[in-house]
A protein has these predicted regions:
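Feature captures the catalytic ectodomains and active-site-proximal regions of enzymes
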Residues: 1-411
């Protein structure tokens, strides 16, 4: 069976930058390994026909594994629950429950009411660590838990809320969308939204006056002073991948919902720690982990969450810095794994790049370019081809849900 590596660079495409001459990051960065693979492989663009939700994150992995998101993707919440080993009943609704930092016009805004007077200062709760978060979530559980509402401890700012028999029709927004903005237009709406808002508002006085946050303020840190509930969904039971494919596979990612998709499909999973600011050592370790896993696995999907590096300490990273991060990914992940595939001779390498899931996109930049490298094929037909959104735009849209079937049919 031919072995396959899938590298998913998530949150890379999505916009062009005036500072880069209105080019995208892929156009501006020096990416010799990606360009070489594009010249010697198949270049195209991925998506799911008739799917209006953005093709990125765990939904992109779900589609690649051959599961139609129209049928199987209800939201990130239940897959986060799987990664946390939380057992959900059929009528439960799982919400991502993030600790965030809200700021008022004259301070941190101690008032309970959520509205236009509060701004999203930090969607990551001021970088709260897991030890502090545990004390905060424990207190939330003591005061807000009920027969129908349950909170589960995760890591850092990321946790889970389960609404037993609740509504999955609430329209929620990722807190990253609201960064630096008044939160009123980002609050939950729709059927059941009032209950979700009330829980978020009830968390405010509990967290604002918690000793952990008082210590954080005294130490010059931002308080994790509100729960933000989003990403609701009911649990899904995916048909096991082994019913369609006899091989063994592994998913490697720092992202809970992404890992949850792999687990639900019956793959092995490795959840790694997040890396700050495109850390080279982390990227090198990720490539080594992938190469090692392929020694015993037939498929390894490795997730590079580029979106996590777009904002650092409430500030958008300069485009030139993002270009540097992309060049690191090209060298230390894609280049390293290309060399590994070439050394083995018969391995397949796929790279897919998807848009940042929570920002306004523009034109061709919003698409998801991909390439498949089956090995050197002599002199390429297009020796000067580069891997970019603009090059992929000239190719027809490929249905992501059909790729896995194609790969597994090729022995």
């Amino acid at each position: 069976m031919r072995k396959t590596i899938v590298i998913h660079v998530d949150g890379l495409t999505g916009r062009s930058f005036p500072e880069l001459g209105n080019q995208t990051l892929l156009q501006s960065a020096r990416t010799p390994y990606l360009d070489h693979l594009a010249c010697h492989g198949e270049l195209g663009r991925l998506g799911v026909p008739r799917e209006l939700r953005r093709f990125s994150g765990e939904m992109a992995l779900l589609a690649f594994l051959g599961y139609d998101p129209h049928k199987w993707y209800t939201g990130p919440g239940p897959f986060e629950g799987v990664s946390m080993e939380v057992v959900l009943d059929a009528h439960d609704v799982a919400y991502l429950c993030h600790l965030v930092t809200l700021r008022g016009e004259d301070g941190w805004g101690d008032g309970k009411k959520l509205g236009s007077q509060l701004f999203m200062a930090d969607p990551f709760g001021g970088g709260v660590d897991t030890e502090d978060a545990r004390e905060l979530i424990d207190t939330i559980n003591e005061q807000l838990v009920s027969e129908n509402i349950q909170f589960y401890m995760g890591h850092h700012h990321r946790h889970l809320m389960v609404w037993v028999g609740g509504s999955s029709k609430v329209v929620c927004r990722n807190p990253q969308e609201a960064l630096g903005q008044p939160i009123d237009t980002y609050l939950p709406t729709g059927d059941g939204a009032q209950i979700v808002r009330e829980l978020m508002e009830a968390s405010r006085p509990i967290l604002c006056h918690h000793p952990v946050n008082q210590e954080r303020l005294n130490g010059g840190l931002k308080p994790a002073n509100c729960l933000w509930l989003w990403g609701p969904g009911k649990p899904v039971e995916l048909p096991p991948l082994k019913e369609r494919w006899p091989g063994k596979g592994t998913v490697i990612s720092p992202d809970g919902p992404y890992v949850g998709v792999g687990t639900t499909a019956g793959l092995q999973t490795v959840k790694v720690e997040n890396a700050g600011e495109g850390d080279i050592a982390w990227l090198q370790a990720l490539a080594k982990m992938t190469s090692t896993a392929l020694e015993t696995q037939d498929l390894v999907c490795v997730h590079v969450p580029f979106y996590a590096w777009l904002m650092i300490d409430e500030q958008a990273q300069p485009p030139t810095t993002l270009v540097e991060y992309l060049e690191r990914v090209d060298e230390h992940v894609i280049g390293a794994l290309e060399q590994s595939c070439t050394a083995k001779g018969s391995h397949r390498l796929m790279v897919m790049c998807t848009p940042f899931p929570h920002q306004q996109e523009d034109g061709a930049a919003a698409m998801s370019p991909f390439l498949v490298f089956e090995g050197e094929n002599g002199n390429p037909e297009h020796p000067h081809l580069t891997f970019s959104e603009q090059e992929a735009a000239n190719r027809p849209l490929r249905d992501a849900t059909k790729l896995f079937e194609r790969f597994t049919a090729d022995k």
